[in-house]
From Swiss-Prot:
GO molecular function: NADH dehydrogenase (ubiquinone) activity
InterPro entries: NADH_UbQ_OxRdtase_su1/FPO (IPR001694), NADH_UbQ_OxRdtase_su1_CS (IPR018086)
PROSITE patterns the UniProt entry points to: COMPLEX1_ND1_1 (PS00667)
Stated family: Belongs to the complex I subunit 1 family.
Record's subcellular location: Mitochondrion inner membrane
Protein name: NADH-ubiquinone oxidoreductase chain 1
Gene: mt:ND1
Biological classification of the source: Eukaryota, Metazoa, Ecdysozoa, Arthropoda, Hexapoda
């Protein structure tokens, strides 16, 4: 019974995160509309609330294209894997009710965020384009260099909180 409740809780968490991302993009569009002195997305429906749902319908009904010489399976699996990794990060966050008991939640967070780098590299490699591969390798090198400083800052905060 506890497993079913934790599964329902994690599914509810994932749905809330995805819906909140949709409405944060709506907020971003509204702020950009006010900054640029133009009409924002608040003209659709009631205060623009249906806009994220219309965007989702538009994205799901678009024609899917892929490079002709690409590795088709890894070209489409790598963004999906990246999405799942970013959703797994939310499972280790402490909430009022613990979904899963993590003794090493910080290490799980660092592992999931560092694995997200390699999906960019696989997407660049699987397109069979030299430019996409170089861009993926550049993104990997840049992200790894930022992760080292992030981990050192996190360990410094952890060390000073223990003293």
């Amino acid at each position: 019974m506890e497993f079913i409740l934790s599964l329902i809780g994690s599914l509810l968490l994932v749905i809330c995160v995805l819906v909140s991302v949709a409405f944060l993009t709506l907020l971003e569009r509204k702020v950009l509309g006010y900054i640029q002195i133009r009409k924002g997305p608040n003209k659709v429906g009631l205060m623009g609330i249906p806009q994220p749902f219309c965007d989702a319908i538009k994205l799901f009904t678009k024609e899917q294209t892929y490079p002709l010489l690409s590795n088709y399976l890894s070209y489409y699996i790598s963004p999906i894997f990246s999405l799942f990794l970013s959703l797994f990060v939310w499972m280790c966050m402490p909430f009022f009710v613990k979904l899963y008991s993590f003794n090493l939640g910080g290490l799980f967070f660092l592992c999931c965020t560092s694995l997200g780098v390699y999906t960019v590299m696989v997407a660049g490699w699987s397109s069979n384009s030299n430019y996409a591969l170089l861009g993926g390798l550049r993104a990997v090198a840049q992200t790894i260099s930022y992760e080292v400083s992030l981990a050192l800052i996190g360990f410094k905060i952890l060390l000073f909180s223990l003293l």
